[in-house]
Amino acid sequence: GFSVYGDYAPHTAMMRSFSRGNNFPTQYPHYGGQDVKYHFMFQFLTGNLEYLGMRIDIAYNAVSSLSLWCFFIMLYSMAKRFFGSMSAGVLSVLFVVFRSGTAFFRFAYEHLQAGDLWETLAGNTAFIGYTPNENWGLWNFNVYLNQRHLGFGLLMAALVLWIFLDWVEESCAEKDKGILWLKNRFLTKKAWMFKKPNTALFAGMLLGLCSFWNGAAVIACLLILMGFAFFSDGKLDYLILAIVTVVFSEIQSKMFVWGSVVSPSVYFGFLAEKKSLPGIAVYLFEISGIVFLGVLVLLFFLKKMERAVAVSILFPTIFAFVASLTPDINVNHKYIIISYAFLAVFWGGAVSRLFHWKGAVGKILSLILALSLTITGIYDFAVILKDNDSGHRVSVNLNSGLTSWLAENLKKDDLILTPEYSINEVTMSGVMMYLGWPYYAWSAGYDTYYRAARAVEIYTTASAQVLKKTVEEEQITYILFEEGMKFEEKECREDVIADTYPLVYQSDDGRIRIYGTKE
């Protein structure tokens, strides 16, 4: 559908590189010939399922849906553990699926003023939002639909957090109160001594092995665990977990990545219009309503353990507003999404408790609170349904003649120069493109500007010598020319390419021609 196909492009290309190719050691299909700077194990699994005979859509949907469903079960279980209520668990999941935010209220007000609210609500197929890139679906359930590997990462993170809730629970059961209780979390032998080092070792291995399933989920989990460690005894167990996680992550990085996996930098303010603490507070209120700022009020009504966990869950969000690990700051939205998902547990508990407070008044207030926490997400979900119905589809022939020829004739070390394709018959062949859609590779940390300039040189040069020299330097083995194509808005010349290299493939309609550059 229209709301998800953009993110499906790099996922499906990577999956096909395993099912129809031999992409190991792994390269990034939209920037072939280099190491992989992207967590790809989800695509590796689904690609291998297709290779073993499962339809690609079934493999893709089965793994991601089961992972997300199991994560929801973990959220439900956490809410029930904290609040002893099934309704708290159900509400927690609903608050993740239907996000909070101010967008719907502002949208409704503007169109009430214009007198076209009902027509707009019925006909609109675009996400609403008034903050940068909110109309991408940056904060709603669409994130889980297009980033299918996120559910698995969240599930593994939730399992590790569930294990270490025992540490927090035991420490919060101590009878000391206030500053004395907090002091004893640092100034006693028990605060540091091992409790269950074997369990910590296992959890570290599990989390570390997930680094190439979803790196953001692993980092967010470590940040939350840092908060757990602050409020827990047995801090050396947390140290074991952190060290083992980093070691296992580094081992995988050395296997798959030639250089650095991340490019860390200080970046204050994320996407907030005003890069200040008040500006960040306003931004958080706009994108999430009361979920983040309101938790500061909730802390006064929570028990000691619940407070410790809620504060810890804020750490990934704090990280998102002060640091960046990739060239694309938008990627930090995942840390906020992860914090939001776990904070939903406490809002589920709050609404559930309020419903049982002081008869009818409590019930009315809880319904108002629940509606305010979901109305924006409910409308977003309606947009998702409309934008992915039968009239809003992007279709690709998975077994076209072009796809089959590329899969059969191009090998792992071949590199094909193409237009800047996102998702089409070429990407579905699993081949390594010199430069696919630039945003995917750029946001993963590749130098797309360099390759774009070289590609322009190849497609536009009038000199056969320049063409051959550039192709040889870039180790390009095939050049694809599409009838009437432009590259970076520049007119392309086929005549020089055709005079220099032999034609090795032409599509049935003559629109696509491929030239081989290998001697």
List the model feature ranges, each with a label.
Residues 355, 359-519:
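Extracytoplasmic
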Residues 141-146, 185-192, 199-215, 226:
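Membrane-interface alpha helices of multi-pass inner-membrane proteins
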